[in-house]
Design a protein with these regions (language model features):
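Substrate-binding/catalytic cleft of secreted carbohydrate-active enzymes
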Residues: 171-173, 289-292, 299-541, 545-564, ...
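Secreted/periplasmic carbohydrate-active enzymes, especially glycoside hydrolases
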Residues: 1-304, 314, 318-322, 343-346, ...
């Protein structure tokens, strides 16, 4: 039976200028210089070495695989001086059978390269391309007769449920490395009860009255257990959870899950943290998911690359509908076509069984560069056809650059389309969002459209009583999102909307808002310690958990004699108190405003049913100068 042995500790890292240090995995060499601005983080080749004793296994009956869950971006793997593998693509799993080269004591060498080149994506984008072995490395010890481990990082099982009314047919294909194997497949419910069973590498199993995976409302998961035997002896076993669900998109009504109208409203997410880069832990993943769920989102765009399998599992468990994509981004490279194909094949094969995933994203803002347009369009057709061939059960989509017009041919290749639009941030005019959506829907009424990105920078240390576009204040970010969430309510035909971004993230080329190296469009800060006011706006609209939030608590010094107090809540009635006295009680929806005559010190409390929030404001002669963006700091501009 298979066994797993982690290889996470005591690696020798040889960095730039032959600098050496002992590190544990996960690790990136850009955790600091990839987040501090200047667009000067090290992109090049580094080396990792590890010595290890031969793992315990029976060489007559077992094999040993070396598995990498993520090495960015290109890697060469050598064991005991023998070059065993080269892998291009920094976000997917790959494995190597190392059985034949193992000795009693072994040396593993991994050369990792994130340097600029013209063939491996991504190369140009508004985020840091951290180099390193930033996900788990481990041994898989398996019987010589086992489920396949050699095909594009697959786990050897492919599960395709088809549901009609009160029954589901679950097509399960297993792939083995021997023709002598007998395979038994069981489907178990969440209580561990076997609800269907069959024998063979290609079976159709029937489930009567299946419980459907229904997003946040009921993310019910079944488990497929495949057992491989040879001459009656169990040699290998794999388990894989899956969900039974249907979905569709109506260009006039939006997204449907299991026949029920299910508007998709959510966030995008990058996989990095302050001071860690992309070398993050399961605890970090859990923290991210908990906050996204608290927000009330029901969908996540996992941008702009394949994320950790652990996070896709969390999406399955928590009921998040997922847009999954490859990093074919910003600029088409004629020499990179094969890499887009290989990354898409790996994405689909490694993630096919996740019920959370409903769309494959083929590219992001690819028309930023206008070079090689014909080859770029052809590459999109190739990827779109590949997705449909490998997975006819899901739809395809792409994210269009803001300057990509509605008539651009690239916007009409995939099944669905999303636009990355920052109208009201990079360009003035909130109303342009309504204008664009109405025009597109008028001209292309049968083309499903969503917003794949929208957002505004917001710094929790910058504030203004009169927020303006480009000032990076927490107040303007909230003002922007207040408009956008109402805009989307006016256009119910949209198939999805994604805030850019759930969390601030590193973009080393940026220098804006007084903190270089960062994109501050997150609803939560990079260290995950501060939820900006905009976070609570979406929570007020999307979450059913009772809460109330007083906005502007970080603008605690105010010079105006009468100040506006804004409250976000999902409760229908709010009472505002100052220094223990009731100021006013209001009924409304989501956003409440009160006019408060300022005293010298103001202990303010908002009460909504059983929940409350409090803050303290001080009446000052002048506005606090620390709230304003310093003159030497750059204001908002697009990264392109």
């Amino acid at each position: 039976m298979r066994r797993i042995q982690n290889l996470m500790e005591q690696w020798l890292f040889i960095g730039p200028d032959n600098r050496q240090e002992q590190v544990n995995l996960p690790h990136t060499w850009n955790a600091k210089d990839g987040q501090d601005g200047g667009n000067d983080y090290y992109r090049g080749t580094c080396h990792y070495e590890k010595t290890f004793e031969k793992p315990e296994f029976d060489p007559e009956a077992e094999e040993v695989y070396l598995e990498f869950l993520g090495v960015n971006a290109s890697s060469d793997v050598t064991v005991n001086g023998k070059e065993l593998a080269h892998h291009d693509g920094g976000y997917s799993t790959f494995r190597i059978n190392i059985t034949e080269v193992l000795e009693d004591r072994n040396k593993l060498e991994v050369t990792v390269d994130n340097s600029v080149n013209g063939k491996v994506y991504p190369q140009k984008a508004d985020f840091t391309f951290y180099g390193g072995i930033y996900r788990d490395v481990r041994f898989l010890i398996v019987s010589k007769e086992h489920f396949d481990l050699d095909y594009l990082g697959s786990n050897g099982i492919k599960i395709t449920p088809e549901v009609k009314e009160n029954e589901a047919n679950v097509h399960i294909e297993t792939f083995t490395n021997t023709e002598e194997a007998q395979v038994n497949v069981q489907i178990k419910d969440q209580d561990g009860k076997v609800v269907a069973e069959g024998n063979g590498c290609d079976v159709n199993l029937n489930i009567q009255n299946p419980i459907r995976w229904h997003g946040r409302k009921n993310p019910y998961l079944y488990t497929a257990v495949a057992t491989l035997t040879v001459n009656g002896e169990v040699k290998d076993e794999i388990t894989n959870r899956f969900g039974i669900r249907t979905f569709s998109v109506d260009p006039k009504k939006g997204f449907f899950l299991n026949g029920e109208h299910y508007p998709l409203h959510g966030v995008s997410r990058h996989q990095d943290f302050k001071a860690l880069g992309n070398a993050i832990s399961t605890k970090n993943h859990d923290e991210d998911m908990d906050m996204i769920c608290e927000l009330g989102a029901n969908t996540i765009r996992l941008a702009h690359y394949q994320h950790n399998q652990y996070f896709y599992d969390l999406c399955d468990e928590r009921g998040m509908v997922v847009w999954a994509e490859i990093p074919y981004i910003s600029e088409h490279m004629p020499g990179g076509r094969e890499n887009t194909i290989s990354q898409m094949r790996e994405l689909i094969v490694q993630n096919y069984n996740h019920p959370s995933i409903v769309v494959w994203g083929v590219s992001n803002e690819i028309t930023i560069s206008t070079k090689d347009k014909k080859d770029m369009l052809d590459n999109h057709h190739v990827l779109n056809d590949l997705c449909h061939k490998m997975d006819p059960t899901r739809l395809t989509t792409l994210a269009c650059y803001a300057m990509c017009g509605p008539f651009n041919r690239s916007a009409h290749i995939t099944d669905l389309v999303g636009w990355n639009l920052y109208l009201g941030w990079y360009v003035p005019g909130f109303f342009l969002n309504d204008l664009f959506l109405r025009f597109f829907h008028l001209v292309f009424p049968n083309r499903p459209i969503g917003y794949s990105e929208y957002g505004a920078e917001g710094m929790p240390n910058l504030h203004s009583r009169r927020p303006r576009r480009g000032d990076h204040t927490e107040e303007y970010q909230a003002k922007y999102h207040e408009y956008m969430i109402k805009c989307f309510e006016r256009h119910p035909f949209m198939w999805s909307t994604y805030v850019w971004n759930m969390f601030d993230f590193a973009a080393d080329a940026r220098n804006q808002g007084g903190e270089p190296g960062m994109n501050h469009k997150g609803l939560v800060t990079f260290d995950r310690k501060t939820k900006k006011d905009s976070f609570f706006l979406y929570k007020a609209y999307w979450s059913e958990e009772p809460f109330v939030h007083l906005c502007g608590s970080r603008r605690s010094d105010r010079s105006e004699d009468t100040t506006t107090i804004k409250v976000y809540t999902n409760q229908p009635v709010v009472s505002l108190y100052n220094n223990g006295e009731l100021i006013e009680q209001k009924s409304g929806n989501h956003i409440f405003t009160f006019q408060l005559p300022m005293e010298k010190e103001n202990k303010i409390e908002a009460v909504a049913g059983s929940v409350k929030d409090a803050m303290v404001l001080h009446h000052t002669e002048k506005e606090n100068p620390d709230y304003k963006l310093k003159k030497e700091a750059k204001k908002s501009e697009n990264w392109v």
